[in-house]
């Protein structure tokens, strides 16, 4: 990486931070700080109906209470709609974007196979033009049949054939909202992010983001996808799986737990002290090579 390291943590304000969020924050923070880099915070609140009132402020208070120090102002995607619209216009002018009239039921009826992320691969129904009498509901980005690949610092080589594995994907939804894939790519470029460290639940999205970066002429980033924390049933910790909110009264203990999850040999005694002491230890001893290479780790019951 020729430019100075510039990373970020980008939670969605759909609820309080939980242990899975903390793992991603700790991993991205220490990877940046131990390389003399910057670490930014972005609120990925582009999907406005899912936002919980007060959650963004609660997330920032929790990060602060745990001792995270971010660089610059927090960026809110909900204030960036003009930038996303401009990116869409560029793609339209380049002939890379097209209107899609398909409903979910129509896609389900015509799709021939599942997408790599568990949905359905779009069969390209509207790629050659809208059916007579139909209007665009969403806007899709054209992909091709070639391979889109990258080397993840943890997960190794990752490759997808987007046309088969995903199909042309949505950048503006039928409800008028901008899709996550568009917002994250535009914001990473605008903020000068060049290193992404995040959970492996987003690994399957990365080839789409790389494709979009290329379509917009953006620089490509380096990626490291950390193992995801899962409950004993194998479900990723989330609001939907009733993950417990972090307690600021247990900051040191939770930081030690996150570091151990990430393969670091942090002394257990630090869990009974101050968060600042945990950070001091981590700043001296963080070892990226010790981070587990698997994509998911079950937490004990």
Curated annotation (Swiss-Prot):
Question: Any binding details for the cofactor?
Answer: Binds 1 zinc ion per subunit.
Enzyme class, top EC level, equals ligase
* One Pfam family this sequence matches: tRNA-synt_1c
Residues at which Zn(2+) binds: 100, 102, 122, 126
* Any one GO molecular function term: glutamate-tRNA ligase activity
Q: Which positions does the motif 'KMSKS' region occupy?
A: 236-240
**Keywords assigned by UniProt?**
Aminoacyl-tRNA synthetase, ATP-binding, Ligase, Metal-binding, Nucleotide-binding, Zinc
**EC numbers:** 6.1.1.-
Q: Which cofactor does it need?
A: Zn(2+)
Q: Which GO terms describe its cellular component?
A: cytosol
Q: Which GO terms describe its biological process?
A: glutamyl-tRNA aminoacylation; tRNA modification
Q: Is the keyword Nucleotide-binding in the record?
A: yes
Task: Specify which residues bind L-glutamate according to the UniProt entry for this protein.
Answer: 8-12, 44, 180, 198
Motif range for 'HIGH' region?
11-21
Keyword Aminoacyl-tRNA synthetase (UniProt): yes
InterPro entries for the chain: Glu-Q_tRNA(Asp)_Synthase, Glu/Gln-tRNA-synth, Glu/Gln-tRNA-synth_Ib_cat-dom, GluQ/Sye, Rossmann-like_a/b/a_fold
Q: Which family does it belong to?
A: Belongs to the class-I aminoacyl-tRNA synthetase family. GluQ subfamily.
Designated name of the protein: Glutamyl-Q tRNA(Asp) synthetase
Native organism is Dechloromonas aromatica (strain RCB)
Q: What is the lineage of its organism?
A: Bacteria, Pseudomonadati, Pseudomonadota, Betaproteobacteria, Rhodocyclales
């Amino acid at each position: 990486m020729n430019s100075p390291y510039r990373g970020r943590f980008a939670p969605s304000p759909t609820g309080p931070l939980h242990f899975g969020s903390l793992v991603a924050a700790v991993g991205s923070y220490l990877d940046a700080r131990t390389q003399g880099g910057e670490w930014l915070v972005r609120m990925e609140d582009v999907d406005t109906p899912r936002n919980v009132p007060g959650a963004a402020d609660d997330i920032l208070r929790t990060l602060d209470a745990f001792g995270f120090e971010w660089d610059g102002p927090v960026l809110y995607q909900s204030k960036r709609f003009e930038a996303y619209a401009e990116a869409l216009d560029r793609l339209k002018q380049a002939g890379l974007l097209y209107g899609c009239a398909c409903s979910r039921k129509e896609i389900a009826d015509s799709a021939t196979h599942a997408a790599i992320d568990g949905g359905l691969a779009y069969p390209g129904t509207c790629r050659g033009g809208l059916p007579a009498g139909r209007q665009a509901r969403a806007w899709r980005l054209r992909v091709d049949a070639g391979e889109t690949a990258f080397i993840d610092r943890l997960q190794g080589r990752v490759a997808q054939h987007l046309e088969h594995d995903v199909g042309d994907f949505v950048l503006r939804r039928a409800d008028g909202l901008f899709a996550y894939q568009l917002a994250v790519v535009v914001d990473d470029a605008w903020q000068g992010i060049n290193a992404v460290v995040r959970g492996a639940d987003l690994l399957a999205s990365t080839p789409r983001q790389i494709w979009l970066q290329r379509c917009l002429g953006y620089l490509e980033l380096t990626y490291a996808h950390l193992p995801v924390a899962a409950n004993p049933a194998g479900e990723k910790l989330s609001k939907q799986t009733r993950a417990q909110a972090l307690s600021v009264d247990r900051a040191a203990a939770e930081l030690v737990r996150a570091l151990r999850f990430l393969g670091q040999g942090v002394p257990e005694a630090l869990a009974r002290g101050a968060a600042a002491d945990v950070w001091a230890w981590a700043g001296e001893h963080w070892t990226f090579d010790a981070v587990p290479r698997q994509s998911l780790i079950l937490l004990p019951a």
